[in-house]
Amino acid sequence: MADVGDLKADGSQLRERPSAKPLHLNNSDDAKQKVLKLNDQEDKDHKNDESKKRTYGRTPDGTVFIVPQTHDMVSQLLSPSQPKNLSDIAVLAVLASLILTFYALPKSARVPIFAIIFLFWRAGYNAGIGWLLDGQSKHNRLVLWAKQSHIFEKPETGKNPNPALYKLLKRELETKIPKDYKFEEAPLEYNTWLVFRRVVDLILMCDFVSYCLFALACFNRPQESWFLWALRWTTGIILFLFNLWVKLDAHRVVKDFAWYWGDFFYLIDQSLTFDGVFEMAPHPMYSVGYAGYYGIALMMASYKVLAISIIAHAAQFAFLILVESRHIDKLYNPPPPRLKTFLFVNAFAWRLWYTLGLGYILDRQSKKKNWTKHFIKYGDTKEEAWRQWKSLYHLSMTMSHASFVALAWKMYSLPPDGLTGLTLFRHVLGAGMIALQVWTAMSIYESLGEFGWFCGDFFFDPPSKSLTYNGIYRFLNNPERVLGLAGVWGIAIITWSPAVFYVATTAHILNLAFLQFVEKPHVIKLYGENLREMSGVSKTVRQALPDPVRQWQSAADQYINTTVESIEAMLDRARSKFAGSVDTFVNDTTSLFKSYPARIPISRHHSEDLSGLNLKQYKLEIEGTTLPPAVEQQKNGGREGELARTPAIRTNDFKTLCLEYGAPIRVRWQAPLNHSKKDWIGLYMVTDNQSRKVTRISSNGRWVATNPDAFDSTRADDGILVSDKLLPANDNDEESTDCYTGEVEFHGDKLWWTTGVFEFRYHHGGRHHVMALSQAFEIRIPKFDETDVEVDDNGTIHRAVEETLLPIIQNCFDRDPEIAPSTSEEPFGSLVERDGKFARRVVFAVHQMFGIEFAPEVVQADGTVRNLAWRICNAKKVLAPYSMSATHGRNTPTMG
């Protein structure tokens, strides 16, 4: 780097640029500031010459390094100017084998085989790469694999078990990156990313080539006019070229770093301008970037290609939602406010109710008059049913629109550059669409009146058996289908938020379903042949079209109607057949189990050779914050028999271990020298395990490894304090031998946040064989005894409640100084409001200690220990008339 090995803290000597040796800084924040400074300096020094500009990145541990220039996969594989290596030859060989397979197969076998091949590579892309990236994002799994395998360490150190693989990787990667890169000096994260992207190259190239070969196998020449042929090919080519431009422009903006998901491994801090295709649509590489698939389907004139394109596109969106978006939110976005989530769920729920809920009521009313029957059953009239329906419909419609506007208002943010360019166009277009929907709604109400607006013909017989086509209905048969949701889309275009677009899309689909499956059958039943087949606008447009297009439209309409009727008939047949098959299956299965009542044993562990391990050398000791001895007296409350009311007499020095609720617990372990590095310690309720030798219930995350880096998860190492510390044998004990000791701490989410009796279990080799058990201990929340505290100067117990409450709340907040208060006046940290688990812990403790149950929102609203203590005292005053226990102080108002 610049020489990053010789860089000073103030950033001097940045212009010397001798080597690419990384710089190791103290923490991630310092590294971020250094990278920003370096990249800004490079932008200034080489503003007019991009070829000489270097890019700097950083790893999570604070290592700053030069990110060498790399090239896209197509250039690497096919460009003669780019150096080639063994992995390039392997990828090209796989691609060549796909092409040879295509030509070797008979035409009848190409379609099914290449459909399977493409779906395999698509699964490798979305499921395979998605799984790897998800593990890397959550647990740093790929980097941990590389670290544990030592494949990037020099063979001279003796740690690398595969020197030949090291030399191969060094030759492969340095061949590809001749400038600013040394294999042995590059950070572990960057080398891991380089190997990962070679796997990505193979999967992505095979995915695209197998799709193209499948499309060629499905090529079809339909009988059509020259006009349709030209229209189909022109549209397909335009979509394909548009797809190509989207990919190239996206790569121009994000470079290889984002193209190959580099931010899952390391980060580049610099100022980027997201122009071009990124101003056109959200996530352009996954949305409009798949237009070429549909263009190819058009050119091939194949519904099979269209179907598999839709499947691939849907899988890509699933990859975006489940993997990439979660990582982006985790890395770049602060935790989303709970209000936004609530507003989204609220708008979505109201839209579902408005279409599905009201649609179901209207469907039952149309077929069985269920709504009217319900009111008549309880003594009301059909007029009352009609009035109640109008109220419900109006409320549902108002809340549906209001909740959507509230969501859009919360999601909307004015761009930093103001209303200019495309942003201004979006606002003008959106405002126009909103005005269009308002005008449409007013026109519909003027034409239909109150009776038609509230679907009156579902409840009363219409005054006429023929529809009157006036107002807006003179031009459109069903304006709600075409213009009814224009304003919803206008708001979505203005906000430009994925959440608002999702609700708008859902609303449109549900509206079309309502019109097709609820309103249309009812209108046909009422008015039958008196319906107008074609609206005024449709008739005018149809007359302006050429004859071939009109003929094609008629044929297409007939084909679609025939297809819909066939599908409905097929579903009816399948429904009856499926119901009969299910009955047969249930009867056969029942008789089979009656005939063969065998028990199938299920075991969750495999037999394993534990010879050579001495169980006597495994030990566990517990150290935690114990409760005062006075708490033990709360066990005896006068509820026992006469003999059991006195404290039990012990015959040894054993003491019951009773620990504080939520306090960290340290566990010291001892194991033989040959113990497995994948040993682990779990925390369980004593009553959850019947066996003392094998654990048969999951720990739900309440476990810590004995040795660091033994598992593919950073969570496993959280809590390790000491590992494999040699404990020499006791010379005075002949049976004593050398052994290892260590210490781990259970805190936060690794604790049980309830009361009960628990134990720690030491497990062998990453499995569930129990090698040692700790002493059973109890987690208890002592009752607050008002008779045993002193009142303050005001005659209240407020101060005593504060003092009792403060340590409990500190434990509930994981004793984290960022959120846990150090005094009763200090406010809670902001994380308490964002994550409800902290408030729920406090609510449970308060209920156990004071006998008062609060909602978690009360804890978040109070914000300090003092306020919460005041609320507890006030609640005890209010509930005092219902309590028979004696109290100190003035708990009820005095008359005087």
Curated annotation (Swiss-Prot):
Bias type Basic and acidic residues, positions: 1-19, 27-53
Record localization: Endoplasmic reticulum membrane
Protein's membrane topology: Multi-pass membrane protein
Lumenal side: 1-85, 134-198, 247-256, 301-304, 363-403, 449-481
One GO BP: phosphatidylcholine biosynthetic process
Annotated InterPro entries: Phopholipid_MeTrfase, Phosphatid-EA_MeTrfase_fun
Region feature Disordered, mapped onto this chain: 1-61
A GO molecular function held by the record: phosphatidylethanolamine N-methyltransferase activity
Top-level taxon of origin: Eukaryota
TM segment ranges: 86-106, 113-133, 199-219, 226-246, 257-277, 280-300, 305-325, 342-362, 404-424, 428-448, 482-502
EC id: 2.1.1.17
GO cellular component: cortical endoplasmic reticulum; endoplasmic reticulum membrane; perinuclear endoplasmic reticulum
Catalytic reaction(s) noted: a 1,2-diacyl-sn-glycero-3-phosphoethanolamine + S-adenosyl-L-methionine = a 1,2-diacyl-sn-glycero-3-phospho-N-methylethanolamine + S-adenosyl-L-homocysteine + H(+)
Pathway(s) this gene product operates in, as recorded in its UniProt entry: Phospholipid metabolism; phosphatidylcholine biosynthesis
Keywords, in A-Z order: Endoplasmic reticulum, Lipid biosynthesis, Lipid metabolism, Membrane, Methyltransferase, Phospholipid biosynthesis, Phospholipid metabolism, S-adenosyl-L-methionine, Transferase, Transmembrane, Transmembrane helix
Cytoplasmic side: 107-112, 220-225, 278-279, 326-341, 425-427, 503-896
Described function: Catalyzes the first step of the methylation pathway of phosphatidylcholine biosynthesis, the SAM-dependent methylation of phosphatidylethanolamine (PE) to phosphatidylmonomethylethanolamine (PMME).
Family from the record: Belongs to the class VI-like SAM-binding methyltransferase superfamily. CHO2 family.
Protein name per Swiss-Prot or TrEMBL: Phosphatidylethanolamine N-methyltransferase
Gene: cho2
